[in-house]
């Protein structure tokens, strides 16, 4: 089984904000793979299907970003999945807007959603797809920036990054993640 989780904040207020780019990617995967997100349990919205012969679970935690681990740990337990079955998609301030970077493990890097996951999973060893949202300019506070909407100029870059994320997730169904990581990171 493959569990793909996109991190974000629930509710209309946060739709299409920089911090919710993980949710955007899950929505796109849901459309591409025809997996309806129709279950609400474990503080999450999720759906299950089969893609390329593999059982896939797409998840959007409905906890706030900083509590994402409270949703994903119980889902992994319920479906008898492990951290090695998990791929997490989330925003990254340290990457330029629209760039993606894949990693197999690492620290939280200041991202509270990832910090929560590491705490609840008991390990930093899970696959990640980071989508760059850039850094705030002109003295804007980070919290205001990540909870703000993408500008008209940023939107096409984010749409492209979400498309690349879908392709990376598709590739990881048939190839080892390390191989997918090397392929996609080389083209960043």
UniProtKB/Swiss-Prot annotation:
PROSITE patterns xrefs: PEPT_TRNA_HYDROL_1 (PS01195), PEPT_TRNA_HYDROL_2 (PS01196)
First-tier enzyme category under EC: hydrolase
Site residues, Stabilizes the basic form of H active site to accept a proton: 91
InterPro entries: Pept_tRNA_hydro, Pept_tRNA_hydro_CS, Pept_tRNA_hydro_sf
A GO CC term assigned to this protein in UniProt: cytoplasm
GO molecular function, one term: peptidyl-tRNA hydrolase activity
Origin: domain of life: Bacteria
Primary localization class, coarse: cytoplasm
GO biological process: protein quality control for misfolded or incompletely synthesized proteins; rescue of stalled ribosome
UniProt: tRNA binding residues: 14, 64, 66, 112
A Pfam family: Pept_tRNA_hydro
Site feature Discriminates between blocked and unblocked aminoacyl-tRNA, where: 9
Keywords: Cytoplasm, Hydrolase, RNA-binding, tRNA-binding
Function as written in the Swiss-Prot or TrEMBL entry: Hydrolyzes ribosome-free peptidyl-tRNAs (with 1 or more amino acids incorporated), which drop off the ribosome during protein synthesis, or as a result of ribosome stalling. Catalyzes the release of premature peptidyl moieties from peptidyl-tRNA molecules trapped in stalled 50S ribosomal subunits, and thus maintains levels of free tRNAs and 50S ribosomes.
Assembly: Monomer.
Protein name: Peptidyl-tRNA hydrolase
Source organism per UniProt: Bacillus velezensis (strain DSM 23117 / BGSC 10A6 / LMG 26770 / FZB42)
Gene from which the chain derives: pth
């Amino acid at each position: 089984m493959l569990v793909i989780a996109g991190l974000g904040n629930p509710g209309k207020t946060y739709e299409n904000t920089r911090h919710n780019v993980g949710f955007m990617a899950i929505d796109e995967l849901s459309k591409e793979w025809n997996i309806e997100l129709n279950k609400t349990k474990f503080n999450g919205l999720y759906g299950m299907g089969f893609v390329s012969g593999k059982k896939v679970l797409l998840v959007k935690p409905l906890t706030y970003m900083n509590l994402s681990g409270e949703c994903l740990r119980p889902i992994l337990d319920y479906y008898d999945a492990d951290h090695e079955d998990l791929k997490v998609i989330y925003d990254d301030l340290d990457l330029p807007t629209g760039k993606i970077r894949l990693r197999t493990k690492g620290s939280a890097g200041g991202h509270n959603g990832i910090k929560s996951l590491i705490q609840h999973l008991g390990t930093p060893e899970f696959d990640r797809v980071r989508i760059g949202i850039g850094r705030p300019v002109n003295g804007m506070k980070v919290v205001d920036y990540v909870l703000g909407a993408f500008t008209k100029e940023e939107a096409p870059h984010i749409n492209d990054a979400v498309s690349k994320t879908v392709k990376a997730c598709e590739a990881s169904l048939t190839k080892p993640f390390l191989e997918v990581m090397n392929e996609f990171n080389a083209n960043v």
